[in-house]
């Protein structure tokens, strides 16, 4: 009995002395159940502390997670600075895209060309942070002729023999046509098949505030070409079409004439021209005609004025080409 009392002394005050009852007092003989609430709380706090320590260790010892967390915090600021850089050079991309559209044809989507050029810039910028031992990837859409030229330049640079400088200016016609064919573009010489932009349909005076217009996408569906986007522009390049700028698209979206398209192109056509096409021999009796798709609308004076200037520019350009063309013998 005395030994048992000595063994129980280190347990400290009993539950009754602390104002509580220990479950060990009610247990079976010879079994000590430590149910001191203070001990339970101490153990629980230790478990929680150990759990937090392990989680913190996992997060901060993984370099990929740590760097990605930092990148996610800095990404909005980085995006703003990248957008500022692109805005600085956007005027060059816009001029180049418009020049391509003038040379190739009106069916070229200038906005899409700009977006692709910006994405290519970002892809090439990745090479700034690539390993020196890795091979620099080539663009998939580079033309074969350009690839051969660059490879020859690199080989001559290794040999130390300089290449003769190329003369600036437009390449010969046969080279230009072969390059375009390699890129997958259907090229038609303008000298053989000129686009006629003359006559009463190209008279800017016909455009006024009462003139009704339709979206190019709806005109495409109305003439039975809804399955192929932009087919109407390829089949009828003589039609006057106006590419809406961001200000025009904002007004059209506010008036519920079109949905917000973001960076996509939106063309406006004259409703009278579309109905004249539908009544022509090419479409008369066509079962795919859906003229009910033409949801016409009128435009404000400031937009009509821009369309007049645009039509006058195209018409005047064709007149100059007709004057400069040599007489046929």
From Swiss-Prot:
InterPro entries: DNTTIP1_dimer, TdIF1, TdIF1_C. Residues 1-22, 147-178 are annotated as: Disordered. A motif (Nuclear localization signal) lies at residues 164-170. GO terms for cellular component: chromosome; histone deacetylase complex; nucleolus; nucleoplasm; nucleus. Keywords: DNA-binding, Nucleus, Phosphoprotein, Transcription, Transcription regulation. Residues 147-158 have a biased composition (Basic and acidic residues). Residues 56-147 are annotated as: Important for dimerization. The N-terminal domain mediates dimerization. GO terms for molecular function: DNA binding; nucleosome binding; protein homodimerization activity. Its main location: nucleus. Monomer and homodimer. A minor proportion may form homotrimers. Interacts with ZNF541. Interacts with the terminal deoxynucleotidyltransferase DNTT. Interacts with TRERF1. Identified in a histone deacetylase complex that contains DNTTIP1, HDAC1 and MIDEAS; this complex assembles into a tetramer that contains four copies of each protein chain. Component of a histone deacetylase complex containing DNTTIP1, ZNF541, HDAC1 and HDAC2. Identified in a complex with KCTD19, HDAC1, HDAC2 and ZNF541. This is Deoxynucleotidyltransferase terminal-interacting protein 1. Residues 159-173, 216-237 bind DNA. It is found in: Nucleus. Residues 197-316 are annotated as: Important for DNA and nucleosome binding. The modification Phosphoserine is found at residue 161. Increases DNTT terminal deoxynucleotidyltransferase activity (in vitro). Also acts as a transcriptional regulator, binding to the consensus sequence 5'-GNTGCATG-3' following an AT-tract. Associates with RAB20 promoter and positively regulates its transcription. Binds DNA and nucleosomes; may recruit HDAC1 complexes to nucleosomes or naked DNA.
């Amino acid at each position: 009995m005395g030994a048992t009392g000595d063994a129980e002394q280190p347990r400290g005050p009993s539950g009754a002395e602390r104002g509580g009852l220990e479950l060990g007092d009610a247990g079976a003989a010879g079994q000590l159940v430590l149910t001191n609430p203070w001990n339970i709380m101490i153990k629980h706090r230790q478990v929680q502390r150990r759990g937090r320590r392990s989680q913190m260790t996992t997060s901060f010892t993984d370099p990929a997670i740590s760097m990605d967390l930092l990148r996610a915090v800095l990404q909005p600021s980085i995006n703003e600075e990248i957008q500022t850089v692109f805005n600085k050079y956007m005027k060059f991309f816009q001029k180049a895209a418009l020049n391509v559209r003038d040379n190739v044809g009106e069916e070229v989507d200038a906005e899409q060309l700009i977006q692709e050029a910006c994405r290519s810039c970002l892809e090439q910028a990745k090479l700034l942070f690539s390993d020196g031992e890795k091979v620099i990837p080539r663009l998939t859409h580079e033309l074969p002729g350009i690839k051969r030229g660059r490879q020859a330049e690199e080989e001559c640079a290794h040999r130390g023999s300089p290449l003769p400088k190329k003369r600036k200016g437009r390449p010969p016609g046969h080279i230009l046509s072969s390059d375009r064919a390699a890129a997958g573009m259907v090229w038609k010489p303008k000298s053989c098949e000129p686009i006629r932009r003359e006559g009463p349909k190209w008279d800017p005076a016909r455009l006024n505030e009462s003139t009704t217009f339709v979206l190019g996408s709806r005109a495409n569906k109305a003439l039975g070409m809804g399955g192929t986007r932009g087919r109407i522009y390829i089949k009828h390049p003589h039609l006057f079409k106006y590419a809406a700028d961001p200000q025009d698209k904002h007004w059209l979206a506010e008036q519920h004439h079109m949905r917000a398209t973001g960076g996509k192109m939106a063309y406006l056509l004259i409703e009278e021209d579309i109905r004249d096409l539908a009544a022509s021999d090419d479409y008369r009796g066509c079962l795919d005609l859906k003229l009910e798709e033409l949801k016409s609308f009128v435009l404000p004076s400031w937009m009509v004025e821009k369309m007049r200037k645009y039509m006058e520019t195209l018409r005047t350009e064709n007149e100059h080409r007709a004057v400069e063309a040599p007489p046929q013998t």
